[in-house]
Amino acid sequence: MAQVLFEQVYYDGSSAQLGDALSTLESGSRPKGGAELDGIPSIGAENIERFGQYDYTKEKFISHEYFKRLNRGVVHSGDVLLYKDGAYTGKVSMALDGFPHAQCAVNEHIFILRPNELAPSSFFLYFLLLNSENKQALFSRASSKAAQPGLNQTEVKTLPILLPKIEKIVEFDNTIAPFMHQIAKNANENRKLSTLRDTLLPKLLSGEISVN
């Protein structure tokens, strides 16, 4: 339903480039020494699925000290996350209401995108990148120059898109927002239940606790 609503608004737009709708396009980093065993989650290509879906089994971390020094790549609620290189270039997700983490950053393989006043909706931006035509166009750009696909900032910013009138984007945002927040809430609750299961199951199997 959400994609249908998006397309009704999107295909009524005027020709533009993705950069026209962005206030921020940045990637992050990890220390040269590699990932930490714990600390602040550092989102990479291995984690990105789509909004509401995230692979927590492949989590990597950066230290709290490194996180505090970051001037780019810090994730905020409403940020759109784009996998920018490798076999799955173009996969897109979104951070919202503590999903996938209340505090996290991205590594050098992920772009953070934030909309500007011409497209004042992170939800609109997410569905724009989820659109099959735009995903294919990004992947084609990434695959055109090397054996290992990859996108640079210029290739992302110059992606041809359609840009509807601001009031149409705001109307779409108001309509879709309750559904998006509910998806984030459900995802966070599912993670809590999974964590509880993983904590209790070994204790049940060992007899440390009983269901009686």
Feature names for model-found ranges:
Residues G44, N71-S132, S144-Q153:
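A short beta-sheet element
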Residues M1-S29, T158, L162-N212:
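Non-catalytic DNA-recognition/assembly elements of restriction-modification systems
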Residues N134-L138:
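Periplasmic-binding protein-like
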Residues E65-K68, P100, L113-N116, I166-E167, ...:
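Short, contiguous acidic/charged loop-to-helix segments that flank catalytic cores in large enzymes
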Residues Q3, E7, D20-S23, P41-G44, ...:
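Generic alpha-helical structural context detector
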Residues Y10-Y54, E65-N71, Y88, S144:
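Low-complexity, Lys/Gly-biased intrinsically disordered segments
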Residues E59-F61:
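Short glycine-enriched, charge-decorated loop/helix-capping segments at active-site entrances
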